[in-house]
Design a protein with these regions (language model features):
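Short, surface-exposed, polar/charged, turn-prone segments marking secondary-structure boundaries
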Residues: 20-21, 43-46, 75-79, 101-105, ...
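Active-site core of metal-dependent hydrolases
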Residues: 1-64, 68-86
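Short, structured secondary-structure boundary patches
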Residues: 10-17, 70-74, 95-97, 127-132, ...
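C-terminal cap of metal-dependent C-N hydrolases
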Residues: 135-177
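His/Asp/Glu-enriched, well-ordered alpha-helical/loop segment
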Residues: 60-143
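Generic secondary-structure boundary/loop-capping signal
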Residues: 6, 76, 124-127, 146, ...
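Detector for methionine-enriched segments
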Residues: 2, 8, 54, 96, ...
Length: 177
């Protein structure tokens, strides 16, 4: 059971695939509330990440958790080469759009892919912000309207369509430990 697994985790550990329905759902879908053991884990310092992959993002779970005051700490993808030719699309921009469609405020979506991951990795002095002296991968995006977004169960929602218009990758060699 997930409750037993959560008890083994320490503050700062990250639970990924937090918005999936099976095998471990973080919400009671009948009451649309976050399970007590999940909330207790967050109170102990356990972090929760989206990790959208082939079977790990469900709009109903995400909407219920976010509405119950339980947004993800970080947003990531579980994107692998074998996912390129599949029906489930989950680029980081699409995953960000799905979280916004599920009720997460846009600024919180952006923080969950920038400064929060940097802080979790204890690199907040080097990453996660646009400040002189910091490393940054920069992406200029343009919102071009809305689009249809699909979760792994086939449920659809309307959400923002963001297109990358320009990108620049930093040289991270100065961060080597």
């Amino acid at each position: 059971p997930m409750a037993e697994q959560l008890e083994m985790l320490r503050p700062g550990d990250v639970v990924t695939y937090c918005f999936r329905r099976r095998p471990h759902c973080i919400v009671d879908l009948k009451t649309r509330t976050v399970l007590p053991e999940i909330r207790s884990a967050r109170e102990r310092g356990i972090l929760f990440d989206v990790g959208h992959g082939m079977g790990s993002f469900d709009f109903e779970v995400a909407e219920a958790a976010i509405a119950d005051g339980f947004p993800p700490d970080t947003i990531s993808t579980d994107f692998q080469h074998r996912h390129l030719d599949t029906h489930t699309k989950h680029s980081l921009l699409l995953v960000m759009a799905k979280l916004q469609a599920a009720g997460m405020p846009e600024m919180e979506v952006f923080r969950a892919v920038t400064d929060r991951p940097a802080k979790i990795l204890r690199r907040e002095n080097y990453l996660g912000g646009i400040i002189p002296g910091m490393c940054a991968d920069l992406v200029a995006m343009n919102r071009t309207g809305d689009c249809q977004l699909t979760d792994v169960e086939g449920a659809e929602r309307r959400g923002p369509r963001w297109e990358m218009t320009m990108g620049m990758q930093s040289d991270y060699s100065s961060l080597d430990d």
